[in-house]
């Protein structure tokens, strides 16, 4: 009778080990980089360059990083959002998102002045500096999730993995919007 008990216990132990080391499926959701997924789906259509001397109220001359000179038509009539944020000043670095219409004209749909965007910005809970080369320097040591990098992607500002629309960009104010709300920053001197 003792042998039957030992055999039953032995079989139970083998079944437990077999269930622990067998093929099992993971219920964990794999973490994915949402920005990397977007980049695979939608390539960045932003054109970078310097604002040219031929820029006027409704015409943007852009000397691209590749050396080409493109002329964009800037049509902001009827648009609810700001088409040009940060202003247009000859010599400033710009990020332009646009398209070519049926008449082979370049039409700008979003223009971001990167020279105006760079600098020190602060709000109630954030104090950071957007620097050249995609670097963000946080000036608050105790910040839980500081931004460390930035880039423009299809006319939107990416701070780390946070994506924002730039609602307004002026000499002393920056308004960023995402699904959590609108965030206001003022330029720190």
Language-model segments: residues:
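C-terminal motif of bacterial Sec signal peptides marking the signal peptidase cleavage site
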Residues: 15-19
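Bacterial signal peptide processing site
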Residues: 21-24
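Structural detector for short beta-strands of small beta-barrel domains
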Residues: 29-59
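N-terminal glycine/threonine-rich, aromatic-flanked beta-hairpin/loop signature
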Residues: 42-47, 53, 124-164
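Short nucleic-acid-contacting surface segments enriched for D/E, G, S/T with interspersed K/R
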Residues: 80-96
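Short, exposed beta-strand-loop hairpins at the edges of beta-sheets
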Residues: 97-99, 165-167, 171-186
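OB-fold/S1-family single-stranded nucleic acid-binding modules
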Residues: 99-116
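Tryptophan-anchored aromatic micro-motifs
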Residues: 112-127
């Amino acid at each position: 009778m003792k042998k039957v008990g030992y055999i039953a216990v032995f079989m139970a132990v083998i079944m437990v080990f077999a269930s622990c080391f067998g093929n099992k499926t993971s219920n964990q959701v794999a973490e994915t980089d949402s920005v990397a997924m977007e980049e695979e789906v939608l390539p960045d259509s932003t054109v970078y360059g310097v604002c040219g001397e031929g820029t006027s109220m409704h015409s943007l001359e852009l000397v691209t990083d590749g050396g080409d000179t493109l002329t964009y038509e800037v049509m902001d009539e009827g648009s609810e959002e700001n088409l040009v944020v940060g202003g247009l000043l000859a010599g400033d670095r710009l990020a332009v998102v646009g398209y070519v219409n049926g008449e082979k004209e370049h039409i700008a749909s979003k223009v971001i002045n990167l020279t105006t965007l760079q600098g020190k910005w602060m709000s109630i809970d954030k104090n950071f500096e957007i620097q050249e080369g995609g670097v963000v320097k946080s000036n608050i040591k105790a910040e839980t999730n500081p931004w460390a990098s930035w880039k423009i992607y299809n006319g939107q500002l990416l701070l780390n993995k946070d994506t924002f629309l730039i609602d307004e960009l002026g000499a002393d104010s920056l308004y960023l919007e995402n699904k959590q709300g609108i965030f206001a920053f003022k330029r720190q001197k």
